[in-house]
Regions:
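Active-site and ligand/interface coordination hotspots across diverse enzymes
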Residues: 1-61, 186-196
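Short amphipathic alpha-helices and their capping/turn segments at secondary-structure boundaries
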Residues: 26-35, 63-75, 112-115, 149-151
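Conserved beta-strand scaffold positions in the cores of enzyme catalytic domains, especially
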Residues: 41, 81-83, 157-159
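Short, electropositive, low-hydrophobicity segments enriched in small/polar residues
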Residues: 47, 51, 66, 131
């Protein structure tokens, strides 16, 4: 990776006045990037537990995601996998869960970071925020229909529901996801990681 370019991005993030409250508390932007990454995961934003550990998806959601991808934890945190949330910081608690990711992070920082990872073969879009941003008008009327239509976005994007335990009702109401979609995700991830 071009370390100078990457260091400049980190410096910009830390000096951005909108991230001041995090920088002052010693909290760095939380993501995982590598020039050798072949699979990119774009999720929502770090949760409270992730903010405390500073490790992306270091929670129950991450355990489920690793399972859905058909890999182990070591592979998930290897240089083959990049994790770039829609917000690099925990946005705080809302009335019904975490607050949404702040929109400026993806708009102002994603492209510069993505330019440093030229070998991405598959981008897994997790949840509605990443789908709305990256699929734009290509997104269906809701998350469920977008995930159901995942084949339309391949081979570049693979939209999936958030693996949060809070989504257990959705998963129960939509058994086709784990029955039909997850096996395809596992197969694609396996093929990409095996192709060196």
């Amino acid at each position: 990776m071009n370390d100078k370019k990457f260091d400049k991005i980190i410096k910009r993030l830390k000096e951005d006045s909108r991230n001041k409250s995090y920088t002052e508390r010693g909290i760095p932007p939380i993501f995982q990037v590598s020039p050798k990454a072949q699979i990119l995961i774009i999720g929502q934003a770090p949760g409270k537990k992730v903010e405390e550990s500073l490790i992306p998806f270091n929670d129950k959601s991450g355990e489920k995601l690793v399972q859905w991808m058909g890999i182990d934890r070591d592979t998930f945190y290897s240089e083959k996998i990049a994790i770039l949330p829609m917000d690099f910081y925990y946005p705080g608690k809302g009335k019904t869960g975490d607050l949404p990711p702040r929109s400026f992070i993806a708009k102002e920082y994603h492209k510069d970071i993505l330019d440093l990872m030229p070998d991405i073969k598959l981008t897994i879009l997790i949840g509605s925020y990443s789908m709305k941003y990256y699929l734009g008008k290509g997104m269906k009327e809701n998350l469920t229909e977008t995930v159901r239509s995942y084949r339309e976005y391949l081979p570049k994007y693979f939209p999936i529901v958030h693996p949060s335990p809070l989504n257990f009702r959705w998963q129960k109401a939509n058994p086709w996801f784990e029955g039909e979609v997850v096996p395809v995700l596992k197969e694609m991830v396996g093929k990409i990681l095996a192709d060196r």
